[in-house]
């Protein structure tokens, strides 16, 4: 399974907070048999020194959804950006209760709306 590391995403030497996230994705047998590409996407970002965000998306897995791999990538990008914005707003909170309330009330609809807009823009760019 090929693995890669983008050095631009690594913290500078001597950084106080160091997170390490390993991700992997395997092309399934059905995708191999039908020639479909891997439609999985994952993104991991350190949004604050004390907060690491991970987003995972799985494509539709059908030839009819030929943009599915791109849609998955857009989904994890949008999710990490939205989580980063949420983390910035919640910086002063000391308990999980406000985070849960904010996440359920605003984060999921924000991700969905931003993802749909990103997909529309991506389709229009083709």
Where are the language model's segments positioned?
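PP2C/PPM-type serine/threonine phosphatase catalytic domain
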Residues: 1-126
């Amino acid at each position: 399974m090929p693995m890669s590391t983008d050095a631009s995403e690594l913290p500078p030497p001597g950084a106080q907070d160091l997170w390490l996230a390993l991700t992997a994705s395997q092309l399934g047998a059905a995708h191999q048999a039908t020639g479909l590409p891997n439609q999985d996407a994952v993104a991991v970002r350190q949004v604050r020194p004390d907060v690491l965000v991970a987003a995972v998306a799985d494509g539709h897995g059908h030839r009819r959804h030929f943009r599915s791999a791109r849609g998955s990538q857009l989904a994890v990008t949008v999710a990490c950006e939205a989580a980063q914005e949420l983390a910035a707003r919640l910086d002063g909170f000391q308990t999980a209760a406000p985070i849960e309330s904010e996440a359920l009330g605003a984060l999921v609809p924000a991700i969905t709306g931003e993802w749909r807009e990103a997909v529309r823009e991506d389709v229009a760019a083709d």
